[in-house]
A protein has these predicted regions:
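Oxyanion-binding/catalytic loops of NTP- or PPi-dependent enzymes
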Residues: 1
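Phosphate-binding and adjacent anionic-ligand microenvironments
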Residues: 5-14, 32-213, 220-222, 231-236, ...
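Catalytic or ion-translocation cores adjacent to nucleophile or general acid/base/metal-coordination motifs
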Residues: 17-29
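Active-site beta-strand/loop architecture of penicillin-binding DD-peptidases
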Residues: 226
Length: 252
């Protein structure tokens, strides 16, 4: 149900993240469907998925909707759209390599996604380009997005208590956690029409963000980062600084 891709780049291979593949698919699918898109056309992504694909969708005039983590919530949106007729699902995806184009399923679909990735690679090849070139074109147009996920394992009763205490600490710090944060979204309070979930999202003025949540299936606390910058080098330096600070907080 998931699909990842590796693209030959010179003498090496580049492994794409789920966010990168998602952004490429969004651009390709919307380009192919541009004559059939309308004001109801909608892209759905999870709250911990990069804004890059969403920004591409916005440029094509799509509505953007977010769900909690888990593809079942994207499936729920499709059901809702079919019942109300107010929106039309075009594409949905999440950072963990799950994609769905069309309404034939209510879960991530690696079969159709793999077919589309092959078509997309052929489309770029016919232009004398690779998927790496396609991704770089997206960065040139929308800015560089550097996404990363850290998972911290905290086992046992003490670990569970520490996870709870960490979430309380992050919640209390609010915008003071880092310089430049202009908004903190606490999904445990019920945001928009989303179910309540123990997730905190910190958003910087430049559109960069960080999200913190306990794993629902393992003794882990997960930290998602999405850094936006004009250059890959600056994004990398900034990510390293933020990650080191978060590590010091969690490992204290």
């Amino acid at each position: 149900d998931r699909v990842g891709i590796a693209v030959k780049d010179g003498d090496d291979y580049k492994l794409f993240t789920g966010n990168q593949t998602g952004a490429l698919l969004v651009k390709f699918v919307l380009t192919m469907k541009k004559d059939t898109l309308n004001k109801k056309s909608t892209l759905v992504k999870t709250i911990v998925t990069s804004e890059l694909g969403a920004n591409i969708g916005r440029k094509f005039g799509l509505q953007i909707e977010e769900t909690l983590t888990g593809f079942k919530y994207i499936g729920d949106k499709i059901n809702k759209y079919e019942q109300t007729g107010e929106q039309e699902f075009v594409i949905g995806y999440e950072e963990s390599y799950g994609y769905l184009v069309g309404t034939h399923a209510r879960d991530k679909d690696a079969v159709v996604s793999s077919m589309l990735i092959c078509q997309m690679a052929s489309w770029y090849k016919n232009q004398g380009k690779t998927l790496v070139d396609g991704l770089n074109e997206i960065y040139d147009e929308y800015g560089y997005f550097l996404d990363y996920l850290d998972s911290f394992v905290l086992k046992g009763k003490d670990g569970a208590e520490k996870i709870q205490n960490l979430m309380t600490s992050f919640r209390n710090k609010g915008t003071a956690l880092f310089d430049g944060i202009e908004e903190v979204i606490d999904f445990s309070t019920g945001i928009r029409d989303l179910p309540k979930e123990n997730v905190l999202k910190y958003i910087w003025k430049d559109g960069s963000w960080m999200a913190v949540r306990p794993s629902g299936t393992e003794p882990k606390i997960k930290v998602y980062y999405s850094i936006v910058d004009a250059s890959k080098e600056n994004a990398g330096k900034r990510l390293e600084t933020i990650r080191n600070e978060i590590k010091s907080i969690i490992n204290a």
